[in-house]
Amino acid sequence: MTGPLAAARSVAATKSMTAPTVDERPDIKKGLAGVVVDTTAISKVVPQTNSLTYRGYPVQDLAARCSFEQVAFLLWRGELPTDAELALFSQRERASRRVDRSMLSLLAKLPDNCHPMDVVRTAISYLGAEDPDEDDAAANRAKAMRMMAVLPTIVAIDMRRRRGLPPIAPHSGLGYAQNFLHMCFGEVPETAVVSAFEQSMILYAEHGFNASTFAARVVTSTQSDIYSAVTGAIGALKGRLHGGANEAVMHDMIEIGDPANAREWLRAKLARKEKIMGFGHRVYRHGDSRVPTMKRALERVGTVRDGQRWLDIYQVLAAEMASATGILPNLDFPTGPAYYLMGFDIASFTPIFVMSRITGWTAHIMEQATANALIRPLSAYCGHEQRVLPGTF
């Protein structure tokens, strides 16, 4: 074949064997950075003002004036509860805290070196396997309540198991935060500790389309069940680039040991271009609005738990990072030492995060199910073009 048609085919064949040029490729957003994939009425992050609201309320105001139960109701229902609604909500939460013998047996059989996040993920899968209810909206609200109520019991059992201690049963006469602390330590600690813990739970409860929340919405978009969506979210949160930062913060502070070492430790890290955990945020560019509330909570806990050393290390690192890089702390930076002073094992910090974020995850799961569309993005192929299989290989 000769002439213009043959020439055109020759050019086409040549192009098919080469990767597309930059101009020919679509606009790829690695990590979906800057991509708006849906609407949500649950929370709003405004990077320009470093603000975060839940259903329109500033999170720092909620942390200062509300209980975690009130915030959970707000995230799920869209409005703060009346006194009567809160009483009924709390009654149902307290009635749902216990785990049965089969769950206790399952937790006891898990290896001692099992990652605490694997314990939480396995427990949620088991709850889903034994739940006979349908997956309609009303049932999902009840399932969300069950997970919120039972997760503290599971996390406390696992932490005590690792310490060689027997579990402590939930106390129906105590509020959410007091009950969890009692199940962990056998007593209700100082008011400053209870208050700081509850505030941390409110501050961690929800944060838009982060990786774990988006994972939950992706699973939900396939019309899978709520437990599968939460399990997917837990798997995402286990990853080092999403959860675990408050654990890393505390490991770093322990490595520093003395406030006098903090400045040189940080300078050496920066010289090696290593990431400093607890600083910076992909969304907030000029500071995390949750930090001042949690820093004050850390200071209160430090006062009653002899935590001046960690407060001093915090101050040195924060000041030096701001001076050297302009990067400010995120919520994980004050939460790490706060949880450590409360007495929690470092390995349990991220499971505690799950206890909080279960409210935000399930709010998003229910919102996704209400106006669902299968989440199915496209990809740009960059491998070999179609090839002929050789006769022998």
From Swiss-Prot:
Disruption phenotype: Cells lacking both prpC and prpD genes are unable to grow on propionate or cholesterol as the sole carbon source.
Listed GO CC annotations: cytoplasm
UniProt: CoA binding residues: 275-279
GO biological process: carbohydrate metabolic process; propionate metabolic process, methylcitrate cycle; tricarboxylic acid cycle
Residues at which substrate binds: 92, 207, 290, 357, 376
SUPFAM superfamilies: Citrate synthase
EC number of the protein: 2.3.3.5, 2.3.3.16
Gene induction: Activated by PrpR.
Active site: 242, 281, 332
Pathway: Organic acid metabolism; propanoate degradation; Carbohydrate metabolism; tricarboxylic acid cycle; isocitrate from oxaloacetate: step 1/2
Keyword Glycoprotein assigned: no
Presence of the UniProt keyword tRNA processing in the record: no
UniProt KW keywords: Transferase, Tricarboxylic acid cycle
Catalytic activities: propanoyl-CoA + oxaloacetate + H2O = (2S,3S)-2-methylcitrate + CoA + H(+); oxaloacetate + acetyl-CoA + H2O = citrate + CoA + H(+)
Molecular function terms, GO-annotated: 2-methylcitrate synthase activity; citrate (Si)-synthase activity; citrate synthase activity
Known role: Involved in the catabolism of short chain fatty acids (SCFA) via the tricarboxylic acid (TCA)(acetyl degradation route) and via the 2-methylcitrate cycle I (propionate degradation route). Catalyzes the Claisen condensation of propionyl-CoA and oxaloacetate (OAA) to yield 2-methylcitrate (2-MC) and CoA. Also catalyzes the condensation of oxaloacetate with acetyl-CoA.
UniProt subunit comment: Homodimer.
Note in the entry: The vitamin B12 restores growth of the prpDC mutant. It suggests the capacity of the MCM-dependent methylmalonyl pathway to support the metabolism of propionate independently of the methylcitrate cycle.
Name recorded for this polypeptide: 2-methylcitrate synthase
